[in-house]
């Protein structure tokens, strides 16, 4: 997934997910999301800045926690 994201960044498509936007819309924080997922806050921060991407299973869990569809979390 990292190589895929790197190649997309190289071609100018850097924002792959909208996790940060949806967190703001739902009035939640990245810290809260990290706690709910049992993940390191630095990992969630990387997702929010699009410097790395969650796997599909995690993205599904994020959607569930934020009461939205996966399609709402991706560009």
Kindly give the residue locations of the regions a language model identified.
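A short, Lys/Arg-rich alpha-helix, primarily the initiator
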Residues: 2-29
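Helix-turn-helix/winged-helix DNA-binding modules
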Residues: 25, 51-54, 65
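Helix-turn-helix DNA-binding elements, focusing on the entry/boundary residues of the two helices
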Residues: 30, 41, 56-59
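Short alpha-helical "recognition helix" segments of helix-turn-helix
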Residues: 33-34
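Recognition helix of helix-turn-helix/homeodomain-like DNA-binding domains
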Residues: 38-54
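DNA major-groove recognition helix of helix-turn-helix/homeodomain DNA-binding modules
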Residues: 57-72
